[in-house]
Structure formats: structure tokens, C-alpha cells
Amino acid sequence: MQDRRSSYDYEDLLACGRGELFGAGNAQLPLPPMLMFDRITEINDSGGEHGKGLIRAELDVNPDLWFFACHFKGDPVMPGCLGLDAMWQLVGFFLGWSGGLGPGRALGLGELKFSGQVQPNIKKVVYNIDVKRVMRSKLWLGIADGTMAADGEIFYRAKDLKVGLFRQDAAVQPAV
């Protein structure tokens, strides 16, 4: 099953997490609390700097988000790894949206730079993913650059985010 809308709300993202959006055994988002965005506001396969696709997603920030209570007591900040994971989640979603089969796994990245922290006073985080390449074979591999902005200021820059979809019948499986 292929779902090619240009935007997705929170209920759609939860359906993806349950394996209902792209079909059982295919690309899924994690369910809360690890789902790191509330909506995908734009997704297409022709936009972005490289003309290969772009994804925009948003997270509404409030002081009650689960990670602020434990990271760190008295100095709450969103863990940087969660923002990075959100970018990997979006690349995997793009692969499923593009018709790729099999469950997804983050495979690495080339470079990551942090220049700010998401604290409870932030109102909105916006993720922008610029797809650079999609390789389609038994393994679907997506390579993209991404940014995470908080209230309009870019805090994270990632280069060469890599995510693969591994068909169940493929000979190559990710190391666990």
C-alpha cells in the first residue's frame, strides 16, 4: 500500500507507527514517546536543493514533554540524540512514502553540528530534510541533509543522514 499525500497529521503518524500507513512489515515510525514530531507539513519527491525530495515536520514544544523531566533535573534540555533521531525517522518515512518495502533502520551520518539547545521555553521545532539520493534495490537507501530549527533559529545541521529499508526476503540484513 502506498500513501502519497503531501502532508500528514498526528493521527496519520500514529497509524504509521502501528504499521497501517505503508502496510505491515514496511516502514514505520516509532510510537510515542519516541515519535519526535507532531505533523509532516510538506513532503514531495521533486523539491529540495537537489530536486530529489524534501520533508518538513514540526514538533510543538511544551514544558511537559517527557524528556524535560529527566534530562536534566534543574537544567531541562531536549537530548540532541532525539533531534537527530527525528531526522532519521523522517528519511525513513520518505522511503516508505516513496514505495520502499521492508522495515527501516538508521545507518549513520556524515556530520552533525549543534549550535543551540531546545529548552522548555521554545514553542516550535521545525525539521527540514533535503533528500540527496535514493537507491532502490533489495535495500532502499536514502541519503539526505537536514536541519532542525527552534523558533526559527537553526540549532542542528546534519549532513549525509543515511537510512535503509530492508526487505524481509533480502539477503542483506542490518547488523543488530
UniProtKB/Swiss-Prot annotation:
NCBIfam families: fabA, PRK05174.1
UniProt protein name: 3-hydroxydecanoyl-[acyl-carrier-protein] dehydratase
Pathway: Lipid metabolism; fatty acid biosynthesis
Lipid metabolism is among the record's keywords: yes
Oligomer status and interactors: Homodimer.
EC number: 4.2.1.59, 5.3.3.14
HAMAP family, sorted: FabA (MF_00405)
GO molecular function, one term: (3R)-hydroxyacyl-[acyl-carrier-protein] dehydratase activity
Family the UniProt entry places it in: Belongs to the thioester dehydratase family. FabA subfamily.
Predominant subcellular localization, coarse grouping: cytoplasm
Active-site feature positions: 71
Role: Necessary for the introduction of cis unsaturation into fatty acids. Catalyzes the dehydration of (3R)-3-hydroxydecanoyl-ACP to E-(2)-decenoyl-ACP and then its isomerization to Z-(3)-decenoyl-ACP. Can catalyze the dehydratase reaction for beta-hydroxyacyl-ACPs with saturated chain lengths up to 16:0, being most active on intermediate chain length.
GO BP terms, alphabetized: unsaturated fatty acid biosynthetic process
Cellular component per GO, a single term: cytoplasm
Subcellular location: Cytoplasm
Keywords assigned by UniProt, alphabetized: Cytoplasm, Fatty acid biosynthesis, Fatty acid metabolism, Isomerase, Lipid biosynthesis, Lipid metabolism, Lyase
Catalytic activity: a (3R)-hydroxyacyl-[ACP] = a (2E)-enoyl-[ACP] + H2O; (3R)-hydroxydecanoyl-[ACP] = (2E)-decenoyl-[ACP] + H2O; (2E)-decenoyl-[ACP] = (3Z)-decenoyl-[ACP]
Pfam families xrefs: FabA (PF07977)
InterPro entries found in the cross-reference section: FabA (IPR010083), FabA_FabZ (IPR013114), HotDog_dom_sf (IPR029069)
